[in-house]
């Protein structure tokens, strides 16, 4: 085999060997940097296609318990914490009765069986549910969950701006 042919084969095989070695020796990190959990199923709701890049949806149960009240009380603070990104993100409460409006939120009367009650969901501009955030009864823990959601949304907004 000629010298250029050896170089060609070597340059072709080297990345394959490095990739295979990286997989076998666990050089690739297993964890992700997001704070929410990826949904294990694909769920797309065209009703949630709004004029914003992202939507934060809260799945309100039929009977609003203490956990639900804590999450509902902290939603306006979450919207305020978005700061300059407020125009890029919508807040939506799913299954909210009409007699209890919340500042800066929209109401969508959807019953989605796959969604867990009291969870926050991050929905993209096509209506695809991407991440879920577990609820908390304690206000301090709810704030920590929302801080993680804010970090995720800011990262996503930054990435979408660069593409």
Predicted feature locations:
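Structured, soluble extracytoplasmic/luminal domains of envelope-associated proteins
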Residues: 76-122
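Alpha-helical transmembrane signal-anchor/signal-peptide segments
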Residues: 27-44
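Short active-site neighborhood of thiol/selenol oxidoreductases, capturing the structured segment around
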Residues: 50-65, 75
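Hydrophobic membrane-insertion alpha-helices, especially the h-region
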Residues: 2-26
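Thiol-/selenol-based redox modules, centered on thioredoxin-like
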Residues: 130, 134-163
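A short, hydrophobic beta-strand/beta-hairpin element that forms part of a small beta-sheet core
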Residues: 75, 118-135
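Short acidic, S/G/P-rich loop/turn micro-motifs used as interaction or catalytic elements
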Residues: 61-67, 98-99, 137-138
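Solvent-exposed, acidic/flexible segments
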Residues: 64-71, 142, 146
């Amino acid at each position: 085999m000629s010298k250029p042919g050896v170089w060609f084969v070597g340059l072709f095989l080297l990345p394959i060997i490095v990739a295979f070695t990286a997989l076998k020796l666990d050089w690739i990190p297993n964890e992700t940097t997001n704070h929410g959990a990826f949904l294990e199923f694909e769920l797309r709701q065209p009703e949630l296609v709004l004029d914003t890049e992202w939507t934060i949806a809260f799945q309100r149960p039929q009977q609003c318990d203490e956990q639900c009240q804590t999450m509902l009380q902290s939603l306006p603070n979450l919207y305020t914490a978005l700061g300059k990104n407020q125009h890029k993100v919508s807040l939506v409460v799913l299954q909210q009765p009409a007699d209890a409006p919340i500042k800066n939120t929209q109401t969508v009367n959807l019953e989605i069986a796959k969604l867990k009650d009291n969870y926050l969901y991050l929905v993209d501009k096509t209506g695809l549910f991407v991440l879920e955030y577990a609820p908390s009864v304690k206000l301090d823990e709810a704030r920590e969950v929302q801080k993680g959601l804010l970090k995720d949304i800011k990262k996503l907004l930054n990435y979408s701006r660069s593409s």
